[in-house]
């Protein structure tokens, strides 16, 4: 969260000219960051930690109860992400996290191929990769990929 605040200060620094309104603007920015941005990112971190743990519980004990818990955790984790999209700055912007977490449209065919092959290398990319390779990796991971795996037609899937 400290990184977000530093990035916000860096980005907004150019807008200040030590004029008569700077004190008012500082108050507005501090209120916005402290009251909206940081609590939203904190909630995002906490709810995604829960989601990660619940998905791992399902992985280790695949039954319908654990699957439904994963679906519920996904819904709760998604909410702060949606809110945070109103202010994509800080590390989310600077590190390009948005397309890695929320890429759309999905490449459903590639997702199924990865699952069938067990070759998870297609999920990764590095800075030296082509734009096409990066986009291909981004289109098979993140919130929408997990949504595709957990839900069908808006309803949780069932474990067979």
Predicted regions located by residue number:
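Mature extracytoplasmic or organellar-lumen-exposed domains after removal of signal/transit peptides
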Residues: 1-160
